[in-house]
Structures are given as structure tokens and as C-alpha cells.
């Protein structure tokens, strides 16, 4: 069984026991998160595609950790000006393990 969920402005195809990194959610490690923005649900009996959401479908996940991605370097230089700027950014993410998919 699989589902397509929407969180943080992105869409993810998930199935039970899938571990994925999503944009930061306000939840502690060990907490349970429920996603109601389910765009599609599929399995052996067929696939249901929402317009835009599948009514009554939910995906439950457990928060494993709050983490940060690798550093992205931003380097700006103006030629012949002896002007340069180096900056770094680490995007915060939440690591989830999908527990259950409930198709209504």
C-alpha cells in the first residue's frame, strides 16, 4: 500500500515503514504526526486519486529526530572590487517513519 502526501509545499510517495526527511515540523522526537493532506492512495485493490484530496484518508508517522541538512555554501563576488561574501545555510528537517496509511 502507498500514499502520496503533501507537507511543506512538497509531495512525497510513502508506504509503511518508509523513513523520509520533510521540512521542519513542530514536534518532539517520539511524537506522532497525522497527515490529512493525502493526494492519492493505492494498493492491491486499486488506486484512488483525490480531487484534490482523498476524503477521509490519513497517514500517521512517528518523529524519529529533528535534524539539519548539509551546508549549502553561498559565495558572492564582485569582480575587480576586492569584494566577496561567503555564507552558509543548513536547512532544518524532520525525520519521520511512516507508521500507517488509513484509506477511508
Curated annotation (Swiss-Prot):
Keywords for this protein: Ribonucleoprotein, Ribosomal protein, RNA-binding, rRNA-binding
Superkingdom of origin organism: Bacteria
First and last residue of the signal peptide: none
Alphabetical GO biological process terms: translation
GO MF terms held by the record: rRNA binding; structural constituent of ribosome
GO CC, any one term: cytoplasm
Pfam families linked: Ribosomal_L21p
Keyword rRNA-binding (UniProt): yes
Hydrolase recorded as keyword: no
InterPro entries, sorted: bL21-like, bL21-like_sf, Ribosomal_bL21
The protein's assembly and partners: Part of the 50S ribosomal subunit. Contacts protein L20.
Role: This protein binds to 23S rRNA in the presence of protein L20.
Similarity annotation: Belongs to the bacterial ribosomal protein bL21 family.
The name this protein goes by in its record: Large ribosomal subunit protein bL21
Biological source species: Gluconacetobacter diazotrophicus (strain ATCC 49037 / DSM 5601 / CCUG 37298 / CIP 103539 / LMG 7603 / PAl5)
